[in-house]
């Protein structure tokens, strides 16, 4: 009989037990827990397949839109065309003083604010027609020692873009307009800082502007409107002691945004005469001017006329008498009564002259 040492037997048993030391049977496999185990496995496999399909769909254009709707896709916002942080476009001027260059650059900057491409409309000095252009090309060759730029009107194209109407004016006119622009800008800054009160601004404007009234009249105005509405407006201002300036021009020009700038050059003598109008148009304008003279003859001194009927005119009116204060009601009534009597006498005299 083979005898095995007891130590060898014990060591073999220990090796056999060590091979099963990591196996722990905590729950028996039965019908009750089989369904739950299967569900866990099935859900895990289902989730794995969904992730795989989603990954494949993300590589396709059509499937990608289905997997990621547009509302969940973040795209960088596009910068609008007329953004304020756009690089400034400067034009180099070879002529003119520093002040003239600043005035021209101010106009160019305003043009690009209204139209980011710099598209403009210009008035041809020879044909007097409005033509399309671009400020980059239009500004070439301009002698700032003699002339300057001015925006006389703005045409609205859409919500973002506008087309300015640019005109070449004398250098002194451009500098005067630029000085006014800087003065208004400085005044606005002082008011924002609280240094300048609105009452001071009103006090200055009261002395300069309140006593001078501006009325624009179209050459195409109807006779009834001129004799009623406009006549009442003009006479009322003259009776109050206000100085009145009448501006007569074509309907298209008088209704523009910067209509007043068209009259800046009438104070100086113009070179050459404007083109002659048809006889019917000229007679219509002559009738308008004569009617205005008749309306203001009783309440204003002899009017000062500038310009001519072929283009535009200015009529400056100064009231004859200074009316008394509002608190002197009796004197005011007597004055109105006297005016009515004088007016009635003139009508009677005109009627007698017509009968003769």
Swiss-Prot record:
GO CC annotations on file: mitochondrion
UniProt GO BP: mitochondrial translational initiation
One Pfam family named in its UniProt record: mIF3
Top-level taxon: Eukaryota
Assigned keywords, A-Z: Mitochondrion, Transit peptide
Additional note from the record: Present with 319 molecules/cell in log phase SD medium.
Entry protein name: Altered inheritance of mitochondria protein 23, mitochondrial
Lineage: Eukaryota, Fungi, Dikarya, Ascomycota, Saccharomycotina
């Amino acid at each position: 009989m083979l005898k095995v040492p007891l130590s060898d037997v014990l060591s073999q048993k220990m090796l056999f037990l060590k091979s099963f030391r990591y196996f722990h049977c905590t729950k028996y496999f039965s019908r009750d827990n089989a369904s739950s185990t299967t569900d866990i496995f099935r859900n895990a496999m289902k989730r794995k397949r969904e992730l795989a399909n989603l990954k494949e769909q993300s590589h396709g254009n059509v499937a990608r839109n289905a997997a990621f709707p547009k509302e969940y896709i973040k795209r960088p916002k596009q910068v609008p065309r007329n953004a304020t942080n756009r690089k400034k476009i400067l034009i180099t001027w070879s002529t003119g003083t520093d002040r003239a260059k600043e005035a021209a650059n101010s106009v160019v900057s305003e043009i690009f604010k209204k139209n980011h491409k710099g598209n403009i409309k210009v008035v041809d000095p020879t044909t007097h027609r409005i033509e399309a252009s671009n400020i980059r090309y239009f500004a070439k060759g301009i002698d700032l020692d003699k002339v300057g730029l001015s925006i006389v009107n703005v045409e609205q194209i859409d919500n973002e873009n506008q087309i300015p109407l640019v005109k070449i004016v004398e250098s002194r006119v451009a500098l005067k307009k630029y000085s006014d622009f800087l003065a208004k800008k400085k005044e606005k800054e002082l008011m924002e800082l609280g240094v300048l009160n609105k009452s001071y601004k009103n006090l200055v404007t009261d002395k300069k502007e309140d006593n001078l009234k501006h009325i624009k009249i179209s050459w195409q105005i109807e006779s009834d409107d001129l004799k009623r509405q406009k006549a009442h407006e003009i006479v009322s201002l003259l009776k109050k002691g206000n100085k009145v300036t009448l501006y007569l021009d074509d309907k298209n020009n008088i209704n523009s945004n910067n209509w007043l700038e068209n009259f800046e050059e009438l104070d100086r003598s113009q070179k050459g005469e404007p083109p002659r109008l048809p006889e019917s148009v000229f007679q219509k304008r002559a009738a308008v001017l004569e009617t205005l003279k008749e309306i203001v003859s009783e309440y204003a001194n002899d009017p000062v006329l500038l310009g001519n009927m072929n283009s535009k005119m200015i009529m400056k009116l100064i009231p004859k008498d200074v009316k008394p204060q509002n608190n002197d009601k009796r004197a005011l009534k007597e004055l109105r009564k006297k005016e009515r009597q004088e007016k009635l006498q003139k009508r009677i005299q005109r009627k007698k002259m017509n009968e003769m």
